Amino acid sequence: MFLETICIDHGELLNAGAHITRMQLTAARFRFDAPPLPDLLSLLPRELRDTKVKCRIIYRETQQDISFEKYQPKRIQSLQLVEAAPDYAYKYADRKELIHLLERKGEADEILITRGGLITDSSFSNVVFRQGNLFFTPDSWLLNGTKRQKLLREGRITEKRITTESLHEYQSVFLINAMLDIGDMVSLPVSRILP
C-alpha cells in the first residue's frame, strides 16, 4: 500500500498535479494502474472547508482509504542525527521502519536521518538549510517530496551535498512537506541538531 498526503488550504487543493504524477510513477514502478484521484473538494467535510486540511489517500490498484483532518503542525525544537539507510524512495503507507528510527531520537523532538554521513530527511519531511540568503536541500534525500520538487522548479532552493561535517556552515534548518512550506517557518537553528 502507498500513501499520498495532499494539502487542502481553505478549500484549495495545493500542488495536485505533482501528487497525481507521483501516484502514477509509483504505480508504474510497481506495475499497477494508479487509481484516479477523486474530487477531493466534494468529499471534504463542510466543517473543514475554512482551514488547512491534511488529506491522506491510501492506495494500490484502488483507493483503500481517504481521510481528512485539520492540520496541526508539529512543534519541533530539536533534531537528533540518526544514521540509517531506510528504503523510502516511494511513499509507503507502512512507515514501521521510520517509526523504529524515531525510537532513537532520545530527548529530541524529531530525527534527522543520515546515510554514510550525508544528510537526508526527517521522519516526516524533507529539509532545507539556510546559509545567509540562500536555501539548500540535500541531494541525498530519502523521498523526493512534492514540495521539495516544487521549490527546486521555482528556483527557491538549490540541491547540494550536505554532510554532518558541513552543518556548521548553515544557520537554520526548515522542515518542508506537502503541508509545510519554507514560509511557514517550521525551522530551528542548526545548533539544535544533536549529534
Regions found by a protein language model. Give the residues of each.
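Conserved alpha/beta cores of soluble small-molecule-handling proteins
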Residues: 1-118, 134, 140-195
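Short beta-strand-to-turn element immediately C-terminal to the catalytic PLP-Schiff-base lysine
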Residues: 129-130
